[in-house]
Structure formats: structure tokens, C-alpha cells
Swiss-Prot record:
It comes from Conus quercinus (Oak cone). The cysteine framework is V (CC-CC). Transmembrane segments: none annotated. Residues 23-48 form a propeptide. One of its GO terms (molecular function) is toxin activity. The keyword Nucleus does not apply. Residues 1-22 form the signal peptide. One of its GO terms (cellular component) is extracellular region. The modification Valine amide is found at V60. Belongs to the conotoxin T superfamily. This is Conotoxin Qc5.1. Contains 2 disulfide bonds that can be either 'C1-C3, C2-C4' or 'C1-C4, C2-C3', since these disulfide connectivities have been observed for conotoxins with cysteine framework V (for examples, see AC P0DQQ7 and AC P81755). Expressed by the venom duct. InterPro entries: T-conotoxin (IPR031565).
């Protein structure tokens, strides 16, 4: 009888099983952009606004 409270406490402290996605992916679902894609897009925006290439040899200054 002494083990029952200990067992219940350990059961409550244990992590639950990972949940399964209830909705399977359909052809209309669009995957979210990854962190790498977001960083790449963020770094490209200032270059596009200035009209400069990556090497700064063809900057037009517009």
C-alpha cells in the first residue's frame, strides 16, 4: 500500500506520449518556410532595395 502513492506521483510526473497529427496533409497544404529560408530572405531584401550585387562592384546607387 505504501507504493501506490509513489506510483501515482511518478505516473503524474512522466511525460505524456507525443500526439499524432489528426489531420493528414492534403495537396492544398503548403509547408511552412524553414528558419534557413527566412534568414536567406531577410538577408536578400536590403540588397534588392539598394540595387547592388553581392560583390559591391556593380552598385548603381539608385
Amino acid at each position: 500500500m505504501r507504493c501506490v502513492p509513489v506510483f501515482i506521483i511518478l505516473l503524474l510526473l512522466s511525460p505524456s506520449a507525443p500526439s499524432v497529427d489528426a489531420h493528414p496533409m492534403t495537396k492544398d497544404d503548403v509547408p511552412q518556410a524553414s528558419f534557413h529560408d527566412d534568414a536567406k530572405r531577410t538577408l536578400q531584401v536590403p540588397w534588392m532595395k539598394r540595387g547592388c550585387c553581392a560583390r559591391l562592384t556593380c552598385c548603381v546607387g539608385r
